UniProtKB/Swiss-Prot annotation:
The gene is SAM1. It comes from the Eukaryota. Binds 2 divalent ions per subunit. The metal ions interact primarily with the substrate. Can utilize magnesium, manganese or cobalt (in vitro). It comes from Actinidia chinensis var. chinensis. This is S-adenosylmethionine synthase 1. GO terms for cellular component: cytoplasm. It catalyses: L-methionine + ATP + H2O = S-adenosyl-L-methionine + phosphate + diphosphate.
Amino acid sequence: MDTFLFTSESVNEGHPDKLCDQVSDAILDACLKQDPESKVACESCTKTNMVMVFGEITTKAQVNYEKIVRDTCRGIGFTSPDVGLDADHCKVLVNIEQQSPDIAQGVHGHLTKKPEEIGAGDQGHMFGYATDETPELMPLTHVLATKLGAKLTEVRKNSTCPWLRPDGKTQVTVEYRNEGGAMVPIRVHTVLISTQHDETVTNDQIANDLKKHVIKPVVPAQYLDDNTIFHLNPSGRFVIGGPHGDAGLTGRKIIIDTYGGWGAHGGGAFSGKDPTKVDRSGAYIVRQAAKSVVASGLARRCLVQVSYAIGVAEPLSVFVDTYKTGKIADKDILALIKENFDFRPGMIAINLDLKRGGNLRYQKTAAYGHFGRDDPDFTWETVKILKPKA
C-alpha cells in the first residue's frame, strides 16, 4: 500500500503573532458592535513591553483602543514580564487613520451603494477547502494540531499544568493513503509540542504532563501506535516566550488560520478586516461552498476558488476541483455552487451575518482556526445541501 506523510502546525493564543491577530479582531468586534457599517483595516505588532495598533478605521463607534489591547493581552494570560508581556504596564501605541476616500468611493460609494452593488475592497483570490476525513470536514493534521494548541491553553488556564506559560506551538504528521483522490488517515506518525514553561519544571515532568493532559485527550487512540514519535519541547528549554521571545504581527499565521497547508491559499490574512475585505469574506463563503459540496455527498474532497477586482461586485471567476472524487462532473458542481451561493461582497456580509460584532465574535476566530469550528457564530460553517438536477 502506497502511503505518504503530511504535516500541519498550529500555535496557541499566547504566540506573539496570534496575540496580534486577537488584538486586531477585538478592535473589529468593538467597532462593529456599535456601528455595523464600520470599515476596519487594523494591524497590530508587538515586542517586549509594547503593543502597537495601526491602520485605517472609519466608524461611528467610540472605541478605547488602549483598553481593548490591555484587556486582550490580560485575557490571554500576559500579566507579568516573566511570561513575556505585562498587560497593565506595557506601552500601547495607537496610529489609526480614516479609510482612504479613494477606496471608500470605489467600494461602497461612501456608504451610498446598495448591498448588491458593494464592490470588493481589494483585488485577490481566495480558496475554500473541505475533506471527508474528519467530522469537521477538515484535514486531520490541521484538526489535531489545532486541538492540541487549544488543550495546552485549557490546562494552563484551569491550572491542571500550573507550570505552563501562554506561548506554545504544536505540529502533527499523519500517514495517509490516497483513495482515488480522497485522503484516508492511517496513523499519527509524529506529534511535536513546544510550550513555554516556568523556571522550575523539569523536562521529564513537561513530557509526562503533555502526554497525559494534552495528547491523550486530543489524539484518538486509534491513530497512535508503538511507532508514533513524540517530540516534546525538543529544544530543551522554553522559558522566555511571548513578545519577549519573538516579535509578533497580525496576519503571519494564515495557514494555521485555514487548512494547515492543504488545499490552497491566496495569501490574504483575515484578522482586523471588516466584511468588505474579500480576503476574509471571500474565504468564508468559499469554505461554506466547499463544505456544502462534501457534506451533500457530491465529492469526498473539494477546493473552491473565487477572485475579485477592487470596486467590482461580481466575482471575476469561480473555480472548483474535486480531485477526481466527484459523484458528478466538476462543471456541474460549479453550476450548483453558482446557483446556491452569492459571491458579491455585500451579499456575503448579509447572508453570513458578518456585520455583527461584539461578544468575541471575531476575536474567537483569531486563535485555533477560522474553519471546522462548532460554534453558531461561525456562520460560514453552516451547510447548504446541494442537490443535482435530475
